[in-house]
Every structure is written in structure tokens, then in C-alpha cells.
Amino acid sequence: MGCRALLLLSFLLLGAATTIPPRLKTLGSPHLSASPTPDPAVARKYSVLYFEQKVDHFGFADMRTFKQRYLVADKHWQRNGGSILFYTGNEGDIVWFCNNTGFMWDVAEELKAMLVFAEHRYYGESLPFGQDSFKDSQHLNFLTSEQALADFAELIRHLEKTIPGAQGQPVIAIGGSYGGMLAAWFRMKYPHIVVGALAASAPIWQLDGMVPCGEFMKIVTNDFRKSGPYCSESIRKSWNVIDKLSGSGSGLQSLTNILHLCSPLTSEKIPTLKGWIAETWVNLAMVNYPYACNFLQPLPAWPIKEVCQYLKNPNVSDTVLLQNIFQALSVYYNYSGQAACLNISQTTTSSLGSMGWSFQACTEMVMPFCTNGIDDMFEPFLWDLEKYSNDCFNQWGVKPRPHWMTTMYGGKNISSHSNIIFSNGELDPWSGGGVTRDITDTLVAINIHDGAHHLDLRAHNAFDPSSVLLSRLLEVKHMKKWILDFYSNIQ
């Protein structure tokens, strides 16, 4: 399962802030080139189907519809005593998530499960207005988590009616990152449709100021600090060195040469350069996996440790420090050694839709981020909701409603719900906005000591640490109980 699929939440660079205020870039957002091509060795067998959904589930006058894509794999499904594992698609092409959520495929036989992967509206092929879907805010008005959850509910009802044996089977929602948030909210809003949910790396408390805005970047910094004694200090010092050199034409040329950039730097590009570097450190924290895998380029096991091999001394000369930064960046962008230069427009992956997530980040999904340069290794950046709101209005003609998600889903007041697993990797910066303590006996937290961004949803690997192996066993244990309780209650 390629690492490319797992940056499910990145950042929305509205403006030129170098410390990356939220853009949960769409995970899809990241801009690679074309849609991802799965590794043939892990390609999955499934049927591609479409279901006609209402554009607006919450009004009666709008009769427009669109086709939602979904994937079904039923190799291990049993009509008697089986279950349905339902992936709540997030901000990207559903085929990508299908091919990169190996956990579901690994447990399908044990749970006698049909696998269903539902594409999120406005992503992949599930475009309500075709090529006009992102034309303006009027066309994007139906891109909300509430509408997406209603799509999932309607699709499950359709499956129960049209697949013999599906009706009367327990459905479990599974998702990671934004998809994990949706899985949790799906169980909260539609408990009569799904018996439980696995919400992996789901930062449901990153919203509405429920956690300190600097928590995310502190965790990123701690990942680097733990991987090398002077690693984070070297990165922190690099910002001033970049500023110093960018003040002259010769300095800009030196920066271009030392960092082996594909195009010459100008003073106007310095914020872009800094944002690109900062985003690289963030992405490394999310994909800090215990085995080698393929992201933009091949990545080694524990890539931050590899990065920190080059960042051992912050007190070297400016030129040497930048040369070390280049070597560190090359771990992420050129580990294979095949790239002739580094392109600062290249970030994460392209299979996710940046335009769709950009709109969501400007409406419902408002996640405050900040840095102070003391508790973290980034330049100071203050969260400014007014500026953020104005930037959103300039881009989309809408202003965010930062408190709406708390109103809709309860914020931290969710103890009345049940049967939700919140799993978080302690290395994952999104864990700062996740549920990391049990709320009740049935709202449980599983913390993965050596886990990065939803490592537990990845396919089994011989190099998996014991912490993720245990987490998966616990997750399956809870699911089996939900399934058993379901069948016990209908007898």
C-alpha cells in the first residue's frame, strides 16, 4: 500500500503564510500530476458501481440528482452472519482510498464482510454538476459533511434493498483522517444505520478552538526532536538564514544553487519557498512509517530519522546549514537520487481534490493553526480568523462558520453516543486534535505509540511495530462485539 495515499489532511495556504495555516490541503490537495496508479502488487478486485443521489437531501423543491461512485468487494462476504464494512470516503478519488486501506481487506475474511468504499460528493467522479461543480460558491453550496453523510445513509439503504442478504446485516463505518471524522459523525447522526465506527486519526477536536492552535506544530517538532538531538534546532535556525540570504540578488542566487532548485528564486518567491519547506517537515511527520514505502518518491523506513542524520549541528556556517537542509529535503523529494533539481511547487499528492477541500476549509472545516517559534521549530504565525475569513471570501465569496461543526456534532460533549473507536498514532500531528482518552466504555481511544497518520488502516507489514499490531487486534475485537450484539438483539 503506497504511502501516497495517507496524507489525508494537509494545509490550505490562503495567502503566503510560511507556517502553513490550515489548508488541509486536500489531501488531495497536494499537487502531483495525474491520478495515482496503484502498485499492481496491491491492486484490489472490486466492482465499480454508481448510485443516483439527490443534490440536496434537506430540501424538497430541488429535484436535481447526480451519480455517486462506489466500489464493492464481496469475496469473503457471507449472507448468513456476515457484516458490511463501509468506508466513508474523504477528500479524494475513492479508488485511491480503496487500494490504500489494506486493513479492511486484511480483516474482511475474519469478519465475513462485504467491503463498500463510497466516494465523497465533489471528489473523484462523484461531481454533482460535472465540470461546473467548482465553478462558484452556488455550485459548491452542497459540499458539506452533512450532505455527504446523507449520501452514505441513502447508499446503504439502497444496498440493503438491492443486494440479496444485505438487509439485516450490521454495517460498520471505517475512515481515516477527514474520512475518520465522517465515520465518527456517521455513527453519531445515523446510529440506526451503522452499528459502530472506526475513526482513525480523526481530529474531530481540531475545530472551533477545542484544542490549542499550536498543538499540531508542537507534535511535528517533537517528532524531529526525538529523532535527533539538534534536528529541530537546525530547522528553526534555517528560517533566519533564508531571510538573510534573500535580501540580495547574490543571496537569492546562492539559495537557488545550494538548495538545487529547478527555477531561480526571487524575493517574491521566498514565502513560497518557506511554505514548501515547512510543509515538507509536516508531511514527513505524517508519513513517518516504520518501513520503506513509496510516496512522491521512495521513502526509507522512519524517514525523519534519515532526515535528522543531516541536521546534527545548528551552529555550522550558513552555507553548510543550508546544504544540510538540502540533504534533508532530498530524503523526501529525491531519496532515489534520480531528480536533477527540487521543485518548490511539488508537495504531496494529486489524487485528492484541492479545490473541493479549499471550499470546505472555508465553510465548515475551520481548523485553527499557529506557531510561536519557541515550542515549535517554525516561524511565529498567529491564527487570525478575520484574515482567514476575508481570504476565504476573496477566493470563494463565502465566509466560514467556525462554530457550526460544534453545533452539528457536539464538540467534546459526545458522551451520549456509543460504539466508536478513536485511534491515533502518537507520532501523528493530527493526534493533537483527536480523542486520545476513553470517554465511556463504548467511546474508546486507542493510542499507537509508534504510529504516524492512521498507520492502523494500512495493510499488514512485516515491520509493523507491536503497538499497531495490538491496536488492530483491539479494533477487530470491538467490531466483533458490535456484530455479535447486533445479531443477539434481532433474535
Swiss-Prot record:
Q: Which GO terms describe its biological process?
A: angiogenesis involved in wound healing; angiotensin maturation; energy homeostasis; glucose homeostasis; negative regulation of systemic arterial blood pressure; plasma kallikrein-kinin cascade; regulation of blood vessel endothelial cell migration; regulation of reactive oxygen species metabolic process
The EC number(s) attached to this protein equal 3.4.16.2
Q: Give the subcellular location.
A: Lysosome
Residues annotated as glycosylated: N99, N315, N334, N343, N413
Question: Where does the record place the catalytic residues?
Answer: S177, D428, H453
Q: Which residues cross the membrane?
A: none
Q: Which cysteines are joined by disulfide bonds?
A: C213-C370, C231-C308, C262-C341, C362-C392
Residues of the region (SKS domain) are: 192-332
Keywords, A to Z, come to: Carboxypeptidase, Disulfide bond, Glycoprotein, Hydrolase, Lysosome, Protease, Signal, Zymogen
Organism superkingdom: Eukaryota
The family database entries (InterPro entries) matched by this protein are listed as:
AB_hydrolase_fold (IPR029058), Peptidase_S28 (IPR008758), Ser_carbopepase_S28_SKS (IPR042269)
- Its chief place of residence is other
Give any Gene Ontology cellular component. Answer: extracellular region
Q: Provide the assembly information.
A: Homodimer.
Q: What is this protein called?
A: Lysosomal Pro-X carboxypeptidase
The uppermost taxa in this organism's lineage are: Eukaryota, Metazoa, Chordata, Craniata, Vertebrata
